[in-house]
């Protein structure tokens, strides 16, 4: 198709679309402009994919905090095997101080072979490996009380949220409640050390495991799937009907080249849909009006959940992948020729212009309000809302959600309190029409849907709104279904 300049396209559209204007600088202008005459903020409907650590885990990446702590100790144990006799990095220390310890170390040398450490995930069945673990525990000790608490949480619960743990300690410090730290500066120093190790660990994971083959077709199809009437909140059906009307007019009046521009970002074409569209048109003609297409019939079919409505009538206008991870797994789903956007809201590995944000973000908590009154900036150093101002990521997110109604897909994000401020902004926004969680299903058939909903509820002040917007389990499914 022949596409015009951005300025001319907007003039032709005759509408104000501030978000899309901002995107022209860094999006694929060609596919955007072909769709420009259709862009009306009041009649479009977008989708935000909320991506958390469970998304990386679903792709087989060892990126949980428990994996990270395990990796940290692998590195420390490796240093001893390679000949170091004393370790102390501020988090933990270990010392081989006598001849008995030196003799014990000799029997573990076989764990090193050709410079490679044989102690890896899944090797715990080896007796000598277990003995080395016990030996390391005997000669090591914690140098950081905060790091010790993280380890004990993993030992007792088999998981930990380091950011939530940090905020708990910050509150204990503020309340002078049996806190081993005398100043937030000391606590922040330990957090910075942990953050540095975490970044190093994730870089290793990404370098070793990241590859295009990780992309799962079932997840990609879910990201790009059509809207479903059962997912839309009752309080937002008016906006959904406006979207249906605008999309109907577009697909039934524009030429094929224009429609192709829109469908290409989903990896589709008008040719693939043409026969379905033609058949569908025949089913909604009004015989009393010279076979004109009847919009009301179309809207009724969608609202009645009739299966013969072609999916192209229900595809989102824009898709934003909101990535809370530091890794690049989400980038696999921004395909060539797509106009979808990705926002690494918490920073990226190896990108100085988008630094890692690691801390806590719950301004709705009563204790936070008291901490803010202390007039002590050291307490606010790792509060996410402040760190967001280091880049334009948060501002771009606000621009997106203000531009048009949107649905939220939750993929691998626990929706815990460490991101409560941002999630509340999304979930209670006037343009949010639906929140659909994709849960984790265990091998025994159980799942974490209820736990996820409980976490989501804490991000709402208005429970009535929550019950309307969150999609019930009948219409939800696992992030990675069996066989995917």
Positions of predicted regions on the chain:
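N-terminal regions encompassing targeting/leader/pre-sequences
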Residues: 1-2, 412
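Short linear segments in intrinsically disordered or otherwise low-structure-confidence regions
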Residues: 2-4, 8
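Short Gly/Ser/Thr- and charged-rich N-terminal loops/segments
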Residues: 12-15
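SIR2/sirtuin-family catalytic core signature
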Residues: 21-59, 65-68, 81-99, 338, ...
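Extreme N-terminus nucleophile/cap motif
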Residues: 77
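Extended, H/D-rich, highly charged conserved domains that either
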Residues: 95-385
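Acidic/glycine-enriched edge-of-secondary-structure segments
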Residues: 366-391, 402-417
């Amino acid at each position: 198709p022949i596409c015009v300049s951005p300025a001319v396209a907007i003039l032709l559209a005759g509408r104000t679309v501030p978000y899309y204007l901002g995107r022209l600088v860094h999006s694929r202008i060609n596919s955007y402009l072909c769709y420009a005459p259709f862009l009306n903020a009041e009649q479009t409907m977008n989708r935000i994919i909320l991506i958390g650590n469970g998304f990386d885990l679903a792709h087989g990446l060892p990126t949980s905090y428990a994996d990270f702590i395990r990796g940290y100790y692998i590195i420390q144990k490796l240093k001893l095997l390679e000949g170091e006799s004393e370790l102390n990095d501020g988090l933990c220390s270990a010392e081989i101080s006598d001849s008995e310890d030196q003799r014990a170390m000799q029997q573990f040398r076989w764990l090193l072979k050709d410079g490679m450490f044989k102690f890896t995930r899944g090797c715990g069945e080896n007796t000598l490996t277990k003995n080395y673990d016990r030996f390391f525990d005997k000669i090591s000790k914690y140098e950081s009380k905060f790091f010790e608490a993280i380890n004990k949480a993993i030992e007792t619960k088999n998981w930990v949220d380091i950011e939530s743990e940090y905020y708990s300690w910050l509150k204990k410090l503020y309340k002078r409640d049996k806190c081993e730290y005398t100043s937030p500066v000391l606590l922040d120093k330990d957090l910075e050390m942990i953050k540095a190790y975490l970044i190093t660990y994730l870089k290793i994971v990404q370098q070793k495991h990241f590859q295009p083959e990780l992309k799962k077709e079932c997840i990609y199809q879910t990201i790009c799937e059509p809207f479903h009437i059962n997912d839309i909140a009752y309080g937002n059906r008016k906006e959904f009907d406006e979207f249906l009307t605008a999309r109907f007019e577009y697909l039934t009046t524009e030429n094929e080249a224009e429609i192709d521009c829109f469908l290409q970002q989903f990896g589709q074409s008008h040719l693939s849909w043409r026969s379905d569209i033609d058949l569908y048109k025949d089913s909604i003609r009004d015989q009393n009006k010279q076979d004109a297409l009847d919009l009301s019939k179309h809207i009724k079919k969608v609202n009645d959940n009739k299966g013969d409505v072609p999916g192209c009538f229900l595809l989102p206008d824009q898709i934003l992948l909101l990535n809370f991870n530091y890794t690049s797994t989400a980038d696999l789903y921004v395909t060539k020729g797509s106009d979808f956007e990705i926002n690494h809201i918490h920073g990226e590995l190896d990108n100085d212009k988008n630094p890692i944000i690691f801390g806590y973000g719950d301004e709705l908590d009563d204790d936070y309000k008291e901490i803010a009154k202390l007039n002590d900036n050291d307490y606010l150093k790792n509060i996410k809302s402040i760190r967001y101002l280091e880049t334009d990521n948060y501002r771009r997110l606000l621009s997106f959600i203000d531009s048009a109604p949107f649905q939220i897909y939750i993929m691998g994000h626990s929706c815990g309190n460490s991101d409560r401020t941002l999630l509340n902004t999304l979930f209670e926004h006037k343009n949010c029409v639906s929140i659909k969680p994709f849960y984790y299903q265990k091998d025994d058939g159980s799942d974490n849907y209820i736990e996820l909903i409980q976490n989501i509820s804490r991000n709402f002040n208005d429970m009535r709104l929550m019950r309307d917007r969150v999609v019930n389990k009948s219409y939800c499914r696992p992030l990675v279904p069996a066989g995917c």
